[in-house]
Swiss-Prot record:
Keywords of this entry: Cytoplasm, Fatty acid biosynthesis, Fatty acid metabolism, Lipid biosynthesis, Lipid metabolism, Magnesium, Metal-binding, Transferase
UniProt name for this protein: Holo-[acyl-carrier-protein] synthase
UniProt record similarity statement: Belongs to the P-Pant transferase superfamily. AcpS family.
GO biological process, one term: fatty acid biosynthetic process
Source organism (scientific name): Mycobacterium tuberculosis (strain CDC 1551 / Oshkosh)
Length: 130
């Protein structure tokens, strides 16, 4: 297997929380029901968990876009809902894809890591193909 893309995203928790509270925000539609349920089940800050997941979605998009260097984009920009960050019973994250992006990345393994420090969250995504 070889690495075909690497993406990273860094987000400010206060800025994100402010945007989530704005009327008409797209963030409610960005997260899957499972992601919203996980966020409400955690004892940490409500904005913290979705923020790391948002960063992971952005990191996956950046990794995939980077793997298509000098090629025209083939997916719409509003694909965040098709990228779901799920966790196992120990909280380890994994990416589950649906829709068109799942078809494009069918043979790709996605590795993802999330982190929080102070008022910042970050995620790294690595795409690996056979």
């Amino acid at each position: 297997m070889g690495i075909v893309g690497v993406g990273i995203d860094l987000v400010s928790i206060p800025d994100f929380a402010e945007q989530v509270d704005q009327p008409g925000t797209v963030f409610a539609e960005t997260f899957t029901p499972g992601e919203r349920r996980d966020a409400s089940d955690k004892s940490s800050s409500a904005a913290r968990l979705p923020l790391a997941r948002w960063a992971a979605k952005e990191a996956v998009i950046k990794a995939w876009s980077g793997s298509r260097f000098a090629q025209r984009p083939v997916l719409p920009e509003d694909i965040h809902r098709d990228i779901e960050v799920v966790t196992d019973m120990w909280g380890r994250p994994r990416v589950r894809l649906t829709g068109a992006i799942a078809e494009y990345l069918a043979d790709v393994t996605i590795h993802v890591s999330l982190t929080h420090e102070g008022d910042t969250a970050a995620a790294v995504a690595i795409l690996e193909a056979p």
